């Protein structure tokens, strides 16, 4: 059978900033404050640079029979993964298998 490979997020990426700005504003959060669970101020946490993945993905594309790739953006797993699956197939994901970055629990 086939398997699903996920690459880790480094934090809030470009499509998430509008929502994060609203959450910060609505909750009167201080971007200069270091909140529990972080080792730097919130402003630095949310501005962690977006990781680019070519160095990880290109060797996989060259060495495996890749059936599909999906960029998880707005809509998350549930809206994005089905777009690359052949009709009649499904992906089974176990959310307990990957760590949740503190910023996502915080917001």
Whereabouts are the PLM-identified features?
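Glycine-/charge-enriched secondary-structure boundary and capping motifs
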Residues: 30-107
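Phosphate/diphosphate-binding glycine-rich loops and adjacent basic-rich segments that engage nucleotide
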Residues: 1-33
